[in-house]
Amino acid sequence: MNSGLSSAIIPVHPTKISVHLFEILQGKYAYVKGQTLHSSLRNPGVFSRQLFIHIYKTVLSSCTYDHVISDWHKYEDNIKTRWKNENFTSDSFRKSTYQSWAQTMRMTIDQLVLNNIYQIIHSKITSYERYTDWVMALGLVPVVKQLPDEKLIRQIQSQLSAASKIAAGNDRVMRTILSALEYTVTDMLETLTSIYIPDYSEVTIDYRSKDQLFVGTYKGKHIAVEVITRPVIAKNIFFDSPVQRLFQNIMSCYRTTEHAKLCQLLNTAPIKAICGASTQNVYKDILSHLEQNSQKSDPKRELLSLLVKLAENKTVSGVTDVVEEFITDVSQNIVDKNKLFGSQESTTQGLKKHVSNNVFKCLTSQINEQFDTINKLEKERELYLGKINQIETQLLHLTQDEKQSVSPDNVLVSDTFCSLQTLQSSKLSMTSSDVPKGAAVLNSFFSQYVPPFRELNKDLTLLWESEIFHTFKLTPVVDPQGQRLYVKYTQDTVTILIGPFTYSITKLHQMELINDIFVSMSFNDIASYIYSTSRLAVYIADIGNKYCPSETDGSSSSSVTGS
C-alpha cells in the first residue's frame, strides 16, 4: 500500500481506545451499580414484543368478512342439527350459540397461532444485544449479510404445517390465518437470519477519508457499517457514544481504586524496625566509656559528669544539689565550713571560685559547640547521601528510557505499576534504618493511607445513570417508597434504539414501531388487546349485533374479546 492510500485510510476499530470502550461494557474497568442500566437497555424483550405484535396483527387481518360469515353459518347449522328440539329463535339460544362460537374461535387461535409465535420469538434469531453494545461503545454497527438459516426455517415450517393439519377440517378463517402465519413467519425468519452483527473481536473498521465512508472487514470480506451516531474524525477519533463520554471518569476511578490497593500493600509490608538511641542511653555510654579509659581524678570525666547530671535534672533544686555535690567532690570537703561557722570567705577563695566558674563556662561552651558541629556534619552527610542516591536513580531511569521508545506518560491508560515505578522500587519496606542523632521521625508511615475511591465510585454510579437516562430517554419504575424497581423504554427510547435496528439494520420497513404502552406488558395481555382491536374481532362483534339484537350494547362482544 502506497503512502497516499495509507493516509486516506484511518483505522477506527480495533484501536486502543475502541477496545477499552468494549472492555468497559464487559465490566473490566470500574464496574459500578449504575452500569447495570446497560443490561436493561440491551434486553431484546422490547424488540421481541414488536415482532410479536407485527406477526399477530398481520395474521388476524388476513381473514375477510366472507370467511367469518361463512364459518358462522356453518357453525350455526351444526348447532341446530344437534339441538333439533330447541327454539332456534329464542334469545337465550341465539346468545349461547353466538358466545360459544366466538369463544371457541378465540381459543383455537390461541392454541394454534400464539404457541407458534412464542416459539419463533424465543428462538434467538436477532443480534439486538450486540447491536446495543456497538451503539453504546462506538455509535457504529457492522452488519454481515449471510444466507438465511434454512435449518431453522424448515423446523418452524414443519411446526406450522402440523398446526395446519389440525385445522384442516375446521373453518376457512383458521386456514386463512395459519396460511398467513406461515408466509409472514417465513419472511421474518429469512430477513432476520440473513443478518449477523459480529462481536467487537471479530471485525475491523476503517474510514476512507476520500470516499467519506466507513468500511468493515469480517473474515477477510468487506461488510457494511451503519452509522448510528457519526464520530468526530480529526487528529484522533472521538466517538459520539455514552461510553466515550464516560471514559476519562471511568479510567480515573479505576486507577484510583488500583492505587488504593497498592497503598494497602505498600503500607502494610513487613518492616523490621526504625531504631533510634535514646538520650539517657547516650549519656550512660559516655560515662561508661570514660570510667573504663580514665581515672576518677580525670577532670574531663568530672566536667562531663557534671554536664550529664545537669541535663538530667529539670528542677532548680535538683540543679543546685548537683552543683553543690560537684564542688564538694572537687574540693574533697564533706562539710561547708562557711555555712557551718558563718565565717566569710577570703579574697583568695573568691578568686578561685570566680576562676573556676569561668573555666566551667568555657568548657561547657566548647563541649556544646563540638556536639553541634558533629550533628551538623551528620545531617550534611545524610543530605548528600540522599542526593547521590537520587542522582543514581535518575541516571538509571534515563539509561532505561534510552533503550525503550519514548512516549508521553498517560496516567489514565498506562499501567499502574509503571506509573508508580519509583514507589515500587522503594527500599523503605525492605531495609531497616537508624534514626540519626538529634533527628526526629516526622512521618513513620505506619498509618495506612487509602485514597478516597469509594466516593469516586458513588460519583461514577450517578454519572452512568445520568448519561444513560438522558441519552436514551429511559424512565424508572419505582415502588411506593421511591426505590427504583426497574427501568423501561419510553417512546423516545423506541425511536432512538428500536427504530434504527428495525429500518436500518434489519430492513423491516413493513413493521411498525412498538407503542410504549406495550414495552412492559406480558405477551398474553398484548395478545388480548390486539385481538380485541383486530379486524376479526370487529367482524365477530358485527355478527353478534345482527344475530343477537339484545347484545347491541356491546357488553357481549367486549366480554368475549376481552376474555
Curated annotation (Swiss-Prot):
Any one GO BP annotation for this protein: chromosome organization
What GO cellular-component annotations does this UniProt entry give?
host cell nucleus; virion component
Q: Which Pfam families match?
A: Herpes_UL6
Q: Which InterPro entries match?
A: Herpes_Portal
Q: Which UniProt keywords apply?
A: Host nucleus, Viral genome packaging, Viral release from host cell, Virion
The protein's location, in the record's own words, is: Virion; Host nucleus
Q: Which family does it belong to?
A: Belongs to the herpesviridae portal protein family.
Q: How does it assemble?
A: Homododecamerizes. Interacts with terminase subunits TRM1 and TRM3.
Q: What does this protein do?
A: Forms a portal in the viral capsid through which viral DNA is translocated during DNA packaging. Assembles as a dodecamer at a single fivefold axe of the T=16 icosahedric capsid. Binds to the molecular motor that translocates the viral DNA, termed terminase.
Q: Which HAMAP family match?
A: HSV_PORTL
Record's protein name: Portal protein
Say which species the protein is native to. Answer: Saimiriine herpesvirus 2 (strain 11)
The lineage, from the top, is:
Viruses, Duplodnaviria, Heunggongvirae, Peploviricota, Herviviricetes
